[in-house]
Regions:
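Intrinsically disordered, low-complexity, mixed-charge
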Residues: 1-93
C-alpha cells in the first residue's frame, strides 16, 4: 500500500487543551506514524506518515480537534523530505 508523509500546521486555541495527546490517540487509531509538537507561535505541528486514506482522515480530524480546542486553520504540505524524522509510533514532543 502506498504511504504518504504530510506536515500539518494547526492554528487556533490548540495549546494547553490536550490537542497533541488527542492527536496521538487518533493517529494510533488510524495506524499513522508521526509526531505532534507545540511551536513557539502557539500553533501545533503534526508530521504524519501512513496510507493515503488514513492520513486524509487524520487531516479531517485535525480540522476539529478535541472538544477543548478551537481550530482556526490547518495548513497541509508534503513532507516526504522529512520522512527521516518520523518515529516508529506516534510521539508527542
Amino acid at each position: 500500500m502506498d504511504e504518504i508523509v504530510r506536515r500539518y500546521l494547526v492554528t487556533g486555541k490548540v495549546q494547553g487543551v490536550f490537542f497533541r495527546q488527542s492527536a496521538r490517540l487518533e493517529a494510533k487509531r488510524l495506524q499513522i506514524r508521526g509526531l505532534a509538537r507545540n511551536l513557539a507561535d502557539g500553533s501545533v505541528e503534526v508530521l504524519a506518515q501512513g496510507s493515503i486514506p488514513a492520513v486524509q482522515a487524520l487531516h479531517e480530524w485535525l480540522k476539529r480537534g478535541p472538544a477543548q480546542a478551537r481550530v482556526d486553520g490547518v495548513q497541509e504540505s508534503d513532507a516526504a523530505d522529512r520522512k527521516n524524522e518520523i518515529p516508529a509510533g506516534f510521539e508527542v514532543l
